[in-house]
Amino acid sequence: LKDTIRRYNIPRQLLDDMISGMEDDFHRNRYETFEDLYSYCYRVASTVGLVCIEIYGYSELEAREFSEAWGIFMQLTNIIRDVAEDAERDRIYLPMEDLRRYGISESDVKSGAELLNHPGWKPFVEEYIERAETYRDKAFKLLPLLDRQSRYSPAAMMAFYESILK
């Protein structure tokens, strides 16, 4: 790892942030605001993309911004997809303040299939899908900035996560 970090000039802070995000999963199982969730998503997913683009190679600094969006898009998609599974493990990644805005309680999230019948659930999910799509649109701008031979893997990941979101 040390050789890779040195060879590709990977910023140490990215790795520290990544580890911090993993630690969050041990100590935190709720997020109050979208800003809290964004910070978590950045640490567990965007940092991975930011490390990858250092290895892939890119043509403009703007690639970093798009790579951050790539991680947020993928992690939000995971969170939306895994609500029931996460709730079974007493983890609610969706921001509590946003859930409350739609009249959804913690016990509603933990109710399993009953959550699908909650009147606020569909509009809530639609809002979060729109958020994820906003980050997706920004993430796709990364591809032309990557070295040509490195585009295939991120393009495949983005397409796969886009199919999950649909």
Task: Describe the predicted segments one by one.
Residues 1-75, 80, 84-166:
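Catalytic cores of Mg2+-dependent Asp-rich isoprenoid enzymes
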